[in-house]
């Protein structure tokens, strides 16, 4: 039986996620349609690019409402990555479409004349609230690539922050909903540990 469902939105490449799971010897199910979901109540939702195309891609495959129902009613745990994390919120300044609304906040664009946007490269996370996602992680540097973010460093759902122009939420959690703005699949051993922790401890 698969240990995890990986949503293939059609926007972005899931190859890096698959390689990490192969390295960790986890069985997984790639989700292209609602019928593909296994009974394993864990979902990874990776995403890159822009907000609206990402949401539209999920809707075109009839995945958006199904994911919403699985998370809210059947209590599947979900880990959103990059744009996947942003989609967990109400909306984004980048687009017009609503997100899943699992988290009551919106995504905003970095605003700075001193820093280059997008924020691309390695940056440090500062853990604000104990969470199993960070268990056994010593190196706190992760790889980021984004122009929009969640500027809510003091909100209860924020479990780690990072500074780029200002503090932002680099990892979030509320009940069975988890999100990371960085790319764990591109962050070497510490990123692998994030994915392992989600699968094993969620």
Over which residues does each language-model region extend?
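Pocket-forming structural segment of enzyme catalytic cores
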Residues: 90-165
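Extreme N-terminal starter segment of soluble prokaryotic enzymes
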Residues: 1-5
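Short hydrophobic segments within beta-strands
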Residues: 7-9
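Acyltransferase
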Residues: 180-202
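Short, Asp-centered acidic motifs that coordinate Mg2+ and/or phosphate
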Residues: 42
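Cysteine-nucleophile active-site neighborhood
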Residues: 49-119
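Short acidic low-complexity segments
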Residues: 27-39
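Short, surface-exposed beta-strand/loop micro-motifs that present aromatic residues
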Residues: 166-173
